[in-house]
Amino acid sequence: HSKYKLNMEPNLKEGVGGFRDANLVFWIGKILFNVDNIKNLPSSIIDEKEYKAFRIALEFLFRVRSALHLVSKKKEDQLRLDLIPSVAMLLKYENSQNGHMRFAKKVTGSLKTIRLYSTIWIDALTKDYHTEDTTGKNYIYPRKDTKNFNDILIQLRVHADESFYAHPTYLQQLISIKKPERLNKTLYRTIRTLLYKPHCYSIFRALSYAKLLRYTIPPIKQVVDLPQFDGYHQYAVDIHSLNCLYHLEHIEDNFILTLWEGLSNDEKAMLKLVVFLHDV
């Protein structure tokens, strides 16, 4: 996906969470289990509730692609900014800035849903064929003694002394673990400590991949998947905010790095929070 990132002009076929990802799940399942539908894969791999969310997202993206072909009068897979108004209108969205934003927001959210479940399912389908990881991504894996969401956050915090990625099995645990309907005092205290880690970005990225960013950081809720039609921003607000946090933790300019290192731990944590929420 390095060529087609999840930006403001996503490629519905080749990009993140696109049809290639969904088709890969289907074909691996077809070869291994001789099924004609992802839904018919073993329940140990495909949870019914997860499949429903996946299918709703996929059906919506199929409709978007059909409308995109009609508007562009060719087999166009990239949802360019100039095509969004016409495509949105074909799909019965209000012909207004708000209508276009609602449409683009749903596209981004749907692509993230496909990315999440295809990542988890492809790993589950191919686990018997895995070889030693040589990607250098420093994956973290689920722990058997994890009982609740607070335990998950603590594990993320422990690993955030260096950059890491959440393994697909960890993403599965993230979305499946028991969570209170609303954050409680214990969770708020733990979330606060995440900002003090040198690689807080890795934590927030894992939560974003699991579509739990809005749950864990409530102020970001209104801007998750929100498009920015200003000609300057390349990504939805939450992805842009994550990128900002990444660059704050990976300062390359020596003078700015000196200023950063001169801050106290409390000041660094506060600045991370301000940077992450600057567009809220």
Predicted regions and their residues:
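His-Asp-centered metal-binding catalytic motifs of divalent-metal-dependent phosphohydrolases/nucleases
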Residues: 22, 64, 207, 244, ...
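Short amphipathic alpha-helical face segments that pack within enzyme cores
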Residues: 154, 243-244
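Hydrophobic alpha-helix feature that most strongly marks membrane-spanning transmembrane helices
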Residues: 27, 246-249, 253, 276-279
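Histidine/acidic-rich helix-loop-helix segments that form or flank divalent-metal centers
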Residues: 8, 227-234, 248, 253-266
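Short, surface-exposed loop and linker segments with low hydrophobicity and enrichment for Pro/Ser/Thr
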Residues: 141-154, 255-270
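Amphipathic alpha-helical
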Residues: 233-243
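Non-catalytic interface/linker regions that flank or bridge core catalytic/transmembrane domains
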Residues: 1-233
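Core mixed alpha/beta domains of very large multi-subunit molecular machines
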Residues: 219-223, 240, 254
